[in-house]
Amino acid sequence: MLDHSCQVQRHPHAERGLDLYETPSVAVEALLRVEQLPHSIWEPAAGRGAIVRVLRNHSHNVVASDVFDYGALDFVGDFLKQERMPVGCEAIVTNPPFMIAEPFVERALELAPLVIMLLRLAFLES
């Protein structure tokens, strides 16, 4: 007999304290199929670089930052305290920490001419 129950599992790359959930590459690939992104992009919640790798594989220049150095960053910094975009960047593409997604969206809209947030649909309910 088949078990059709739905089980929720914690993402294997989740880190509770910093709300790190790596974005599946298929999500970024899907984005690239429907959006024409500028060449230079800032990923301010880069984590270990999941989004960054896909964008760079598609020849985008990506500046990667995060509040914690996971080893794949151009600089460490708190996005919510940034006063300007990195030089040359024309867009923000990120999967922000869910617990502070709303302030991330607000800050990104203040800083960038183009903002793409990869968020769970549950964000729309909050």
Segments and roles (model prediction):
Residues 1-126:
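Class I S-adenosyl-L-methionine-dependent methyltransferase catalytic core
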